[in-house]
Amino acid sequence: MNFEVVRPKTLCNRLVVVDGLPGCGKTMLSAVISSLERVELFKYSYEIEVQCILHHFKKADIDTSASLIQYHLDLIIYNQMMARETNFRYSDLSSVFKSVDKLKYFKRLFGPGDEKVPDIIEKQKPIVHLVTHCLSAYSNPLLDNFKN
């Protein structure tokens, strides 16, 4: 039996990925990228890295991996827009306090949530910002979601 995973509507339609070896300056570059208009704070997503590697080693097909990655990207932006899983630890590199627009993230704590979030995402068009480790050679399932 063949099944196709179909999700007609997605939330994450914009993505920037900073990829590289450990210690090569991804965090420094990500601080600059996060300061650009509409770009969210950077986030590490090991779940996405694992899906790409599973596909590379033929433990998951491209459709399954791409669908799970899109689901996870949608979950990331949905949670970010409600300040869920947002880092408020003052000294962390991915902290709100390192952002040029700290107020934006504090407002989200008290803003509308749940069913209003997809409309907010549609209106504001935020850009998910991922930092990955040595993923470029295995990134087909991720790139499959952004063919256009």
Language-model features: locations:
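PAPS-dependent sulfotransferase catalytic domain
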Residues: 127-148
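Pre-Walker A adenine-sensing motif
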Residues: 1-9
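Short catalytic/ligand-binding loop motif for oxyanion handling, primarily in non-cytosolic enzymes
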Residues: 25-27, 48-52, 136-139
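Pre-Walker A (Motif I) flank of P-loop NTPase domains
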Residues: 12-15, 126
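PAPS-dependent sulfation machinery
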Residues: 45-129
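A conserved segment at the C-terminal end of the G1
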Residues: 24-40
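Short, glycine/acidic-rich beta->alpha junctions
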Residues: 10, 21-25, 130-137
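Hydrophobic anchor at the beta1->P-loop junction of P-loop NTPases
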Residues: 18
